[in-house]
UniProtKB/Swiss-Prot annotation:
Keyword Amino-acid biosynthesis: yes
Sequence positions that bind L-citrulline: 86, 122, 126, 174, 183, 259, 271
EC number: 6.3.4.5
GO cellular component: cytoplasm
Residues that bind ATP: 8-16, 116
Species, as recorded: Dehalococcoides mccartyi (strain ATCC BAA-2100 / JCM 16839 / KCTC 5957 / BAV1)
Gene that this polypeptide is encoded by: argG
Coiled coil: none
InterPro entries, per database record: Arginosuc_syn_C, Arginosuc_syn_N, Arginosuc_synth, Arginosuc_synth_CS, Arginosuc_synth_type_1_subfam, AS_cat/multimer_dom_body, Rossmann-like_a/b/a_fold
Pfam families per the UniProt record, alphabetical: Arginosuc_syn_C, Arginosuc_synth
Protein name: Argininosuccinate synthase
GO biological process: argininosuccinate metabolic process; L-arginine biosynthetic process; urea cycle
Reactions catalysed, as given in the entry: L-citrulline + L-aspartate + ATP = 2-(N(omega)-L-arginino)succinate + AMP + diphosphate + H(+)
Subunit structure: Homotetramer.
Disulfide bonds: none
Length: 406
């Protein structure tokens, strides 16, 4: 009896070619697993394709709800933006995919898990580390990392075996998408001087095709988690879709970024993340009103580490769980509503309110009703500037003494 290998199957070029390659190279029975994390695909056709290209069995698992509640919501509370730009859509889905792959491998009695990651990308690290953490006894096979074929050669290999190839050699974009965003790379995008052609974008409208009138969007949060849009309570999936639809209509969410990959190289990446950029910005605005200065400053350091953890494939680490404990505690009073204005490819926060706001109008106003006691400022300024004053007075003397001795 042949050994079983569970393959993370997307229906794309690399994983379709991998089915045949695993059979040729290892003589293993391939079990294809396709995981729905919000991909806009026909999963029935993908399952049929997996069986057609040689898989012994094919699974489709819908984990969108789990992805939103257990991954995306955590990312929002942590304001997760890698290098301050990328909302980590692809990176955030990888640990969940690894978890489902391990679960099915254990159910099937498989001895190995395979994925279609290349040797240059970050995903190979995310999958390998996740799988090794959850099930270290399982062997990991990465065909695209081993076979040494270029993308064009992989296309030729697939065509040799009659595997449909849905992309062209002339413009071979590699695309990944889920609830939280869409990433596009390869082809002409590998030259960072090239402007992305219109065909790169599938979610967001070009600015010239967006409405002339701006649109207002209100997002309500409860303890750091978005729960309603424009006054309507929504499920996690419906809420993300609602914000996505409004933001993409106005051309919001396009990102063109040269980022530092985990493997040590720089990569030009194009992203579409309309819901992500809007919801994270709204959350940050609410935190600015409900967290103290010291909380915000410390949390910003935590957020940078948290984003790196996601990007670097360490979701299942103890440190991520430890940071979650702090982040969850910080969100106790992050409840309220944020109003945003979207227009012509951009947006900005134009209002916020919270029953737990630390903004005190009576203390901040310069108009009638001012409750701030200006006489308090004199003593504060004296103490606040004492360190600088003493240093200015004492160190020039010390420097003169040093000069006299030399």
């Amino acid at each position: 009896m042949s050994e079983k290998v569970v393959l993370a199957y997307s229906g794309g070029l690399d994983t379709s070619a991998a089915v045949k390659w695993l059979q040729e190279k290892y003589g293993m029975d391939v079990i294809a697993v396709t995981i729905d994390v919000g991909n806009e695909k026909d999963f029935t056709l993908i399952k049929e394709k997996a069986l057609k290209v040689g898989a012994k069995k094919a699974y489709v698992r819908d984990v969108r709800k789990e992805f939103a509640e257990d991954y995306i919501w955590k990312a929002i509370k942590a304001n997760s933006m890698y290098e301050g730009v990328y909302p980590l859509a692809t990176a955030l889905a990888r640990p969940l995919i690894a978890k489902v792959m391990v679960d099915i491998a254990l159910e099937e009695g498989a001895t190995a898990i395979a994925h279609g990651c290349t040797g240059k990308g970050n995903d190979q690290v995310r999958f390998d580390v996740g799988i090794n953490t959850l099930a270290p006894h399982l062997k990991i096979i990465a065909p695209a990392r081993q076979w040494g074929m270029t993308r064009e050669q992989t296309m030729e290999y697939a065509q040799k075996w009659g595997i449909p190839v849905p992309i062209s050699v002339k413009n071979p974009f590699s695309i990944d998408e889920n609830l939280w965003g869409r990433s596009i790379e390869c082809g002409l995008l590998e030259d960072p001087w090239n402007e992305p052609i219109p065909e790169v974008f599938a979610w967001t409208r070009p600015v010239e095709e967006t409405p002339d009138e701006p649109e207002y969007l209100e997002v309500e949060f409860e303890q750091g988690v978005p729960v309603a849009v424009n006054g309507e309570k929504l499920s996690p999936l419906a809420l993300i879709q609602k914000v996505h639809d409004i933001a993409s209509l106005h051309g919001v969410g396009r990102i063109d970024h040269v980022e530092n990959r985990l493997v040590g190289i720089k990569s030009r990446e194009i992203y579409e993340a309309p819901a992500a950029v809007v919801l994270i910005a709204a959350h940050q605005a609410l935190e600015a009103m409900t967290l103290s200065k010291s909380q915000l400053r410390f949390k910003q350091m935590v957020e940078a580490t948290y984003s790196d953890i996601i990007y670097n494939g360490l979701w299942f680490s103890a440190l991520r769980q430890d940071l979650d404990a702090f982040i969850d505690s910080s969100q106790r009073f992050v409840s309220g509503t944020v109003r945003l204005k979207l227009s012509k490819g951009s947006f900005r926060v134009v209002g916020r309110k919270s029953p737990y706001s630390l903004y005190h109008k009576g203390m901040a106003t310069y108009d009638k009703g001012d409750q701030f006691d200006p006489s308090s400022a004199v003593g504060f300024i004296t103490l606040w500037g004492l360190q600088a004053k003493l240093q200015a007075q004492l160190q020039p003397i010390l420097e003169e003494e040093k000069g006299n001795k030399s």
